[in-house]
Amino acid sequence: MANPYERGPNPTDALLEASSGPFSVSEENVSRLSASGFGGGTIYYPRENNTYGAVAISPGYTGTEASIAWLGERIASHGFVVITIDTITTLDQPDSRAEQLNAALNHMINRASSTVRSRIDSSRLAVMGHSMGGGGTLRLASQRPDLKAAIPLTPWHLNKNWSSVTVPTLIIGADLDTIAPVATHAKPFYNSLPSSISKAYLELDGATHFAPNIPNKIIGKYSVAWLKRFVDNDTRYTQFLCPGPRDGLFGEVEEYRSTCPF
C-alpha cells in the first residue's frame, strides 16, 4: 500500500545535497508581538497545496533566527512546514528553549494564517536546534513522546542522561567543537538514549560548534533524510541512513553510528 505521507520525487544524493529541494517555498513572518511563548520567527512552507509534517528550529545561546534561517528554507523545500525562531532572549537556557520550541509548534498549528494551518498535519511534528537549542530539542523530546523526530545540532546541555527519550533522534556533532565538545555533550547524549529507539550519531569532520550556522550539505542531507524517514514514514530515505555515510580519512564525516535497521 502506498504511503499517504510520501512527498516529492525519488531521492538521490544530488537532490539531498543541493541547496534547495523540489518544492517551491513561501514565507510567513511571525512578529515578536504576535508570538506567544517565543520570540517570533519565520514560517517556511511549500507552495504546493498539500499536507506536510511540521518542524520547529531553535538557535543557540546568543544566536538569533538568522543563524538557522538556511535550514528553514532548505527543509521546507523538501516538503515540510518549518518555523525558525528567535528566542525570547538570546541568553535563554536549554529548558526554556524546549518550552519555546513547543510554543512555536503550537503557533503554527493554531495561530498561523489559514494558508499555513491548512498545510500542517498536526500529528506529525519534529524539533531541531543548535547548541543550547539542541539541548532544548532533547528536553522537549523527553517531554513529548508524540514527536516524530528530534535533531540536536552540536547540542549543549548540563544534563547528560536522556534515557527517557523515545523519539527517533539524530544527533549531529562536530569534531573541533570546543564550546560543546562531543566527548562531554553529543556523544554522552547519544549513548544515554535507549538502544531500543531509532537513533543515529553523525560527527562532522573538520567542523566547529558553529557549523550549523552556515549552509552545510551534510547537515542538510541527513537532517532531511531523518525527517523524511520518521516524520513522513518514507522508507525511500532509509538508504541514506542505513548504513549511512562512510566515515574516516578524507571524509566530511568523522564518525557515524546508529541503531539501524530502521
Swiss-Prot record:
Annotated binding of poly(ethylene terephthalate), by residue: 61, 132, 156
Keyword Transferase: no
A GO cellular component annotation in the UniProt record: periplasmic space
Record keywords, A-Z: Disulfide bond, Hydrolase, Periplasm, Secreted, Serine esterase
InterPro entries: AB_hydrolase_fold, FrsA_esterase, PET_hydrolase/cutinase-like
Any one Pfam family match given in the protein's UniProt record, by short name: PETase
Subcellular localization(s) per the UniProt record: Secreted; Periplasm
First-tier enzyme category under EC: hydrolase
Record-annotated disulphide pairs: 242-260
Usage in biotechnology: Has potential for application in biological recycling of plastic waste products.
GO molecular function ontology, one term from the record: cutinase activity
EC number(s) given by UniProt: 3.1.1.74, 3.1.1.101
Annotated family: Belongs to the AB hydrolase superfamily.
Function text: Catalyzes the hydrolysis of cutin, a polyester that forms the structure of plant cuticle. Shows esterase activity towards p-nitrophenol-linked aliphatic esters (pNP-aliphatic esters). Capable of degrading the plastic poly(ethylene terephthalate) (PET), the most abundant polyester plastic in the world. Capable of degrading the bioplastic poly(lactic acid) (PLLA).
UniProt name for this protein: Cutinase 1
